[in-house]
Swiss-Prot record:
HAMAP family listed in its UniProt record: Aden_phosphoribosyltr
Any single GO BP term: AMP salvage
Protein name: Adenine phosphoribosyltransferase
The organism of origin for this protein: Mycoplasmoides gallisepticum (strain R(low / passage 15 / clone 2))
Disulphide bridges: none
Family in the record: Belongs to the purine/pyrimidine phosphoribosyltransferase family.
GO molecular-function term, one example from the UniProt record: AMP binding
Lineage: superkingdom: Bacteria
Length: 178
């Protein structure tokens, strides 16, 4: 099933050169959302990985991470932690800074009460590039006195080395690789 899913995803995802900046090749995943059957298959594959990791909650960054994290958490009946850009959450927060492939000095936050101590958190995002966002989320989880138990991505960009920056003792899953 995964081989067929990969083939369908590669036909569906649109690559856009020089977006959002010159030199960046952007993978537009929005056509996946126009195909409910395909989107459901993606979430089902991510759910199988999540079940094996014994995660008890899912955390994803805005905005495209939400597209996969929320339905995955719902499918597994797990709580979902919103990871937002700075000053977007109304209550006390934990904060972590990070850099992206195409931007520096970013800050993300979670509510301080979003993750209970000793929780087992799976980080879900649409794309793994440099791992800047994922590293920042991992630090937020640690601030909440909890543990990242696994990672799941729709796409991994292999030339950017992000996977090497993740905790290799934890399950790391992705569906597509470019």
């Amino acid at each position: 099933m995964k081989t067929e899913l990969i083939a369908q995803l590669k036909k569906t995802i649109i690559t856009v050169k020089d977006f959002p900046k010159p030199g960046i090749l952007f993978y537009d995943i929005t056509p996946i959302l126009l195909d409910p059957k395909l989107f459901d298959q993606v979430i089902s594959v991510m759910a199988e990985v999540a079940k094996k990791s014994n995660a008890d909650m899912i955390a994803s960054p805005e905005s495209r991470g939400f597209l996969f994290g929320v339905p995955l958490a719902n499918k597994l009946k797990l709580p979902f932690v919103l990871v937002r850009k700075q000053n977007k959450l109304p209550r006390a927060t934990f904060s972590a800074s990070y850099d992206l492939e195409y931007g520096k000095n970013n800050v993300i936050e979670i509510h301080q009460d979003a993750i209970k101590p000793n929780s087992k958190v799976m980080i879900v995002d649409d794309l793994l590039a440099t791992a800047g966002t994922v590293d920042a989320i991992s630090r937020l989880v640690k601030q909440a006195k909890s543990e990242v138990v696994s990672y799941s991505f729709l796409i991994r960009l292999k030339d950017l080395g992000g996977i090497d920056k993740l905790d290799q003792t934890k399950p790391i899953d992705y569906i597509l690789e470019y």
